[in-house]
């Protein structure tokens, strides 16, 4: 019951208190895929300079941007593993410098996924107030502190809710 309540809270009010430049979840604020920022440049200069670059490993998920931070997920394969073992992680980056502010990791094995899908997390993180929510490719749902990356809670959707495992892994962003 408590987990259901927590999941319900995650679903409620996902757009309150955003600044115009935030893109805190899949498809942006209110999931409309509309950016209502004003003052957008209409013509880009011929040569743009990269402001910052941060290497991340494999995955399909898009970034979430909120209150000066960029949240991304990836999968780091264990090169010594023959069974597709590795580590998934959420990174919080400073949006101005790209500095890694924190990283939250968990061990995982993609051996139950089709090999062609064993490339990393698929779900864009969601930011709401002081928590960022991330879904792992194998169905872990994590609630992390936006400022520190400390885990507030996590559930295993497969075990805790008897959910089946898609052959391509879990790909729904937490809404």
What is each PLM-predicted segment?
Residues 15-175:
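Noncatalytic, solvent-exposed loop/strand surfaces
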Residues 4-14:
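Sec-dependent N-terminal signal peptides
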């Amino acid at each position: 019951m408590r987990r259901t309540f927590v999941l319900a809270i995650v679903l409620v009010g996902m757009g309150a208190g955003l600044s115009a430049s935030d893109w805190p979840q899949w498809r942006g604020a209110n999931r409309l895929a509309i950016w209502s920022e004003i003052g957008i440049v209409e013509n880009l200069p011929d040569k743009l300079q990269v402001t910052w670059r941060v290497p991340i490993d494999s995955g399909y998920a898009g970034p979430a941007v909120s209150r000066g931070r960029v949240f991304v997920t990836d999968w780091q394969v264990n090169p010594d593993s023959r069974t597709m073992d590795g580590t998934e992680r959420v990174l919080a980056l400073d949006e101005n410098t790209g500095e890694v502010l924190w990283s939250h990791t968990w061990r995982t094995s993609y051996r139950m996924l089709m090999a062609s899908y064993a490339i990393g997390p698929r779900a864009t993180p969601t930011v709401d107030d002081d928590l960022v929510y991330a879904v792992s490719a194998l169905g872990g749902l994590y609630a992390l502190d936006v400022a520190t990356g400390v885990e507030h809670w996590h559930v295993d959707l497969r075990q805790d809710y008897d959910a089946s495992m898609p052959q391509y892994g879990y790909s729904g962003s937490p809404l």
